[in-house]
Amino acid sequence: MSRLVVVSNRIAPPDNKGGAGGLAVGVLGALKAAGGLWFGWSGETGNEDEPLKKVTKGNITWASFNLSEQDYEDYYCQFSNAVLWPAFHYRLDLVQFQRPAWEGYMRVNALLADKLLPLIKENDIIWVHDYHLLPFASELRKRGVNNRIGFFLHIPFPTPEIFNALPPHDELLEQLCDFDLLGFQTENDRLAFLDSLLSQTRVTTRSGKQHIAWGKDFQTEVYPIGIEPDEIALQAAGPLPPKLAQLKAELKNVKNIFSVERLDYSKGLPERFLAYEALLENYPQHRGKIRYTQIAPTSRGEVQAYQDIRHQLETEAGRINGKYGQLGWTPLYYLNQHFDRKLLMKIFRYSDVGLVTPLRDGMNLVAKEFVAAQDPANPGVLVLSQFAGAANELTSALIVNPYDRDDVAAALNRALTMPLAERISRHAEMLDVIVKNDINRWQERFIHDLKEVTPRSPERQQQNNVATFPKLA
């Protein structure tokens, strides 16, 4: 039986007691089924030459390493999060390309390949995750690794007009073709990748999803990531902590609109605040009878763009509350802090509306978690951006354009006044999709397809001559 090797920028610690996110749940499920290794950065800076830190529990080994301060800055902060992240979320105006950062990104991917190489066994299958590791298969191929290597992109893949604006776009595209299987959240993302490829080289396609580019065989497929709906339902339905129970009692005559995500410019938070203001302005009958709570803990606080959006939200929240607030009623609560995941599931359950309106998102698991947390007999309503990957599956949500504040305001009004029968029907349809496409099905489909790939032979590998692009000067 093939062993599974998972590679991601960060690894979830084996003693993690908190609620695991989607990637951790899916990866651990796959690793428990096959046995294997989870390899990645420890999240700490230090001496890169130190031996790997290894922990084994059952049939799973966690192996992690430190990054130097310089590599952390170049690979993680400057290239992954100041170039790839904004570009892949259609924000070229925020891209800060610097050649030393690109060189650091390539250097760290090569370093990771060097560290992983001694741990790889002949029949291992390798599953690589996300935008930090786009060149990783290419680095392994250079070192003679012919194992099956799959890649899953958790964030959107941009259209060629966006992607080709990146100075190393051609290098990145050819490196991606060294994976055997490329997985995307949506069909739009898969097609955007292929369109970018076609803009750079000839691509031969067989059976729709088997391709050859630069002499390299690879497959593309769509794997929308899911959640654990049963676990979320259990967390949501449990007894409320005393403070939350008291708050719920105080707000029993107020309808609650709730949002939670990390503080990021891709989430559309300023636009969301303005849409809520439009709701109060266009539908004054709701004043004093609703409350919008936005939880947005700080993320990447050292990046100027994130500092700017935090200050913008603080300003907008104060302005809206000053304009529409009344004695005894505050229309908008903005909390820039972290809350326990299990507590959030309980807040989801007693919320009347879940407001999830990113400007661009690979999937957005918060939308799925909101649905899974609801009481099926009296569910809340999901208002969801058309630019979230989840909108392709959760078609019974109220789908909105987050750039159109009046459209979002109208959807909020409809959600707040929706009859129970319609709420139940819409919720049941979405829950059915979420249960069928849960996190386990996501990883099982990907691993099954990766195992079906024909391994690359050394002869074919030599013929392909991986990473043939000229070095970026």
Swiss-Prot record:
Keywords: Glycosyltransferase, Transferase. Its EC number is 2.4.1.15. InterPro entries: Glyco_trans_20, Trehalose_OtsA. GO terms for biological process: trehalose biosynthetic process. D-glucose 6-phosphate binds at R10, Y76, D130, R300. It is an enzyme of class 2 (transferase). It comes from the Bacteria. The keyword Glycosyltransferase applies. The record marks W85, I155 as: Involved in alpha anomer selectivity. The keyword Glycosyltransferase applies. UDP-alpha-D-glucose binds at G21, G22, R262, K267, F339, L365, V366, A367, K368, E369. GO terms for molecular function: alpha,alpha-trehalose-phosphate synthase (UDP-forming) activity. It catalyses: D-glucose 6-phosphate + UDP-alpha-D-glucose = alpha,alpha-trehalose 6-phosphate + UDP + H(+). Pathway: Glycan biosynthesis; trehalose biosynthesis. Residues 454-473 are annotated as: Disordered. Belongs to the glycosyltransferase 20 family. Probably involved in the osmoprotection via the biosynthesis of trehalose. Catalyzes the transfer of glucose from UDP-alpha-D-glucose (UDP-Glc) to D-glucose 6-phosphate (Glc-6-P) to form trehalose-6-phosphate. Acts with retention of the anomeric configuration of the UDP-sugar donor. Homotetramer. NCBIfam families: PRK10117.1, trehalose_OtsA. This is Trehalose-6-phosphate synthase. It comes from Salmonella choleraesuis (strain SC-B67). The gene is otsA.
